[in-house]
Amino acid sequence: LAKDTAKLHEVTKKKCLSSKVEVKKLYNDAFDSLILVNHFRFGPAEAKQRYFALAFWPDTKARTPKILNKFLISNGSDILSLDQYQQISVAGRGFYAMEYLLYDETISKKPNKKRLCGLLTVITEDISKTAKEIFNEWTTSYSKKILIVDQGSIYSSEKEVVQELYKSLRTGLQFTADTRIGRPLGRSNKPRPKRAEAYRSSRSMRHITLALTASKDLAINLSKKDPNIT
């Protein structure tokens, strides 16, 4: 995820105005990487609301379009700096904000392409920075707290670590069932397709597949030491 988002930022910064197709490809690659780890929302991802800054969804009050359009229609010429951008609501940050800017049909009618690309660039910079922070904390400190249980660990026993991982597995499966699948299906006589995750970019089914694949891999790894599970 950290590598893919860094590449996404570099290409967006250099080619947003000239090659939107390439930006979209790298965006989708990075989004895949996020969904494959989306069930690990504890630890470094939970700290400082990092996961929500990457993936604010569902957006039940349509806050993302409101926030982004406010910047797009602004009369000012200044582009937001990263520090300024990180002060706004998480609803205006991350992959779903970027999806709106890249795929929403109304955005193509906005006249100021330079302003749009400026916003996309700062979004990818924020995404890349956040993903790197999560990766660095996992690899330099948090992984040790999971692998080595001692007085300095946040877990009191190996059993507690396993419980945290099972909780992550259960929460991920429930989110996919209730939110990714159940929410857009609605009632039998009234489906709500625009409630589907990432519907603008036609990624909804892909997210379900990737999330279930990641959950399956975690379940298999957790059950390897249990002779009662095959």
Protein language model features and the residues they cover:
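Mature extracytoplasmic or organellar-lumen-exposed domains after removal of signal/transit peptides
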Residues: 1-230
